[in-house]
Amino acid sequence: MHDQSPADPADPSRPPGPTLFDWEFATDPYPAYAWLREHAPVHRTRLPSGVEAWLVTRYADARQALADQRLSKNPAHHAGPAHAKGKTGIPGERKAELMTHLLNIDPPDHTRLRRLVSKAFTPRRVAEFAPRVQELTDHLIGRFEGRGEADLIHEFAFPLPIYAICEMLGVPREDQDDFRDWAGMMIRHGGGPRGGVARSVKQMRAYLGELIHRKRDDLGNDLISDLIRASDHGDHLTEAEATAMAFILLFAGFETTVNLIGNGVHSLFMNPDQRERLQASLAAGESGLLETGVEELLRYDGPVELATWRYATRPLTLGGQAIAVGDPVLVVLAAADRDPERFAEPDTLDLSRSDNQHLGYGHGIHYCLGAPLARLEGQTALGTLLKRLPDLELAVPPTDLRWRGGLIMRGLRTLPVRFTPRND
């Protein structure tokens, strides 16, 4: 089922809106988002699942919605039954346990969990992990650079963050391929209610629960051990909370980085002048353009298209529209980050853009806790690729590329590339 924005009866001159959520939209949603920003910035639509929700597309409205605590993250506040039933693919007996994490709860529970998790997932821990991210990046490129061709999604963008977060969590190396298989099942099917997804989630949950149980008796220098150690005035994470947090750090943390790398390389292919600037900067031993460039890639075609669900707990007005209690609200980060009222020439990729307070990792109390790790991985992956494979290019016409369906994430299914083989 697709949504087409109707003409406004009060304004017959307004043309019918674009069709949303079809194949053409998935390939390039930005013209549709531009139309919505201009004509229906807060727009009620029927999603492919049948659920009706408000899409928020302007930057100012998006920041308001992301920070407005009248919009709850708890699905129990949804007025309708369809989404509240939660087609998550998570087995029913474990659903409540795994869904109790930072993305789905509100203060004061959110405040408590965020404070405890922040004591473990620190900027210092991310900085100390940088050399290992570089080693993983070099290892993965080394596996295909002698061939002269690769699928950058399956051979690089996907395994890098899954292995990185596994190592940071403390998953033994001999078990990491299991996580790659489980994560691959979930990313291919978008977390939908399919048997393979449910089995993968169940297996991942069981493994994490057992790993946390073992680590309580043998704490190490890893993130799970630090989650167990984390204390705030005598308060600790329960085993169920630690399991849920490890699950969401792994699942949410890897897919966003897959898409950051894939979308970022694609954007550089489509904007060769910016790619040349970046390669010249890297060749000169400079890092500044890489750092601002990753921020611009997050704004221009970021990994998260829509923020996760919010539900009105009280009546409110957003962008001139009355939002009723129980209404779902989806903030379209991809649309807000192309808003000409906020960004000069928003449809132009400018790797040196300085005024770039994008919403790629959210805003407010739910700002992405893993953003520093994702930035590190994105900078390391893109910088190393461009230095080691300087003539990297698409191996297929851009029109042959296919984007994954789904509501929240934006990413390519495959990214075939070719380059001069390296055997040194």
Task: Label the model's feature ranges.
Residues 1-424:
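Cytochrome P450
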